[in-house]
Amino acid sequence: MSTKSHYRREDIKSGNIAFSPSRTTIETAFYGNNVETITDLKLAYEMAKNTKGTVVTDMPVYMPEKSGLPEDAKVLLFNDGEIVGRFAGARVILGEPAADEGEITKVLREAAYFTRYKKMYHTSAYIGLDTDFMIKANLLIPETYENTLYNWLLNFQILTPFYDEMYKKSKPVGDEPDIYILSDPDYYHPNYPNGLAYFDPEHNCACLLGMRYFGEHKKGTLTIAWGVANRNGYTSCHGGLKRMVKDNGEAYVMGVFGLSGSGKSTLTHAKHGGKYDVTVLHDDAYVISNKDGTSVALEPSYFDKTQDYPLTDGNNKYLITVQNCGITLDSDGKKVIVTEDIRNGNGRAIKSKLWAANRVDKMEDPINAIFWLMKDASLPPVIKLDDPVVASIMGACLATKRTTAERLAEGVDMNALVFEPYANPFRTYPLSEDYEKFKSLFESGVDCYILNTGQFINKNIPKEVTIGIIESIVDGTAKFTSLGKLEDIKTTDVEGFIPDFRDKNYVDVIDVSMKKRIEFVDSLQVAKGGRDNLPDEAVNALHLLLLRIKSL
């Protein structure tokens, strides 16, 4: 699929989805005489390299020509200041009860007006890397934020002759217009002193004000793209997907869903000691066709944490840019990065597409299984869910803990158990639509598992245990038995992590965990005016599950 860039004059009128107060205000700013269009990645690199505050390291980019960069390209570092994570409190989504377009467009008009005092850069990229799903996106950002522009072009697919030709072959779907995003990290409106991330999902536009952190631009773009996918027969996925082929040629395609820090990147890129022929689609953003189960990656590169990668780690070979990390001099006087979150939390880097040796942009094999990654001390390391309703509702109650990738409001407990439906805090449409999409996949034969990547009771679950569980599932050697007396909820014994239903204390722990899920689902009936309320069958399934747990 593709989106629409141009319109016949007779179609430029009220009633066309490409023209609304928000979108027209945002798009108009792109055409000012203070706007310079940047379409060349090598130029974007030079601009980022030369902007004030950039640290040009002495670390060469690996095979830079493969990424469209100069042959002498170096890893660039740029730091943002105090804020080093996304701020959910800044998000305003048109269509939700709290969003008043009349008031918001006043803010947009002011922000657009003040761009006249700055030189602005306009660039474009494709979101989606196959003719099945491609969206054209446009970003407008001020001079001095060349690193953000450069990172955005690296994170998504810059327009090249190869991808331009692919895009031409994509079939336009409906009247979906191109994405337009206006960003001014230096502009703060009095109504939004902590910044504004505004989304008009039906008209494919957004405005980011007071947002320096690159993750806001990455996820802001994906927020709109996932909405387009949802409207056009795809399940939007914030997670990783890979294929593992056994020696007998049998392929197993698995998707893992979790927030930053859940292990989704680690599990997606795990090599399994060469036991399988592993092919990676992506570790963060893709879409699954509800028609045939195939998947398309939305991004070519990887925006990864640097916390687990000390300087000499081999994975750092694939770095292109680094954000919110330190710099020091090595024994040869060379400028090198300081990682492991020594400087601050949530250090980040963009890694090239080459990081995954076997990478594809479309997974032709249909997906076999979905794994919800949770951090819930009541759960054993793995659970298998056979009922499509229970499988989908448990994804809607995906339990985790907050991470350094987020900027939290004052007073929020970092260690509290929270629920993030389908590990996707970037949804702009009613939650019930994701519930139905995932349920449809499970009804079509896709298996569902929960992997607890945190603690079981008070014992950490090592990543090696989790990877071993995945391998036993792929190999067909995992022996699942009923979890207690819950026949359609199964587990497999993992030494040191076996739930004891004779222990009243343990039963109480899992009882409390399920009650919290019910409280969360019940709260959706009120939050956002009930916009994210789930179907009765889902709510009833949770209540029934709680009753069954009480009877154990």
Where are these regions (language model features)?
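Conserved, well-ordered active-site substructure
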Residues: 253-255, 271, 292-307, 460-478
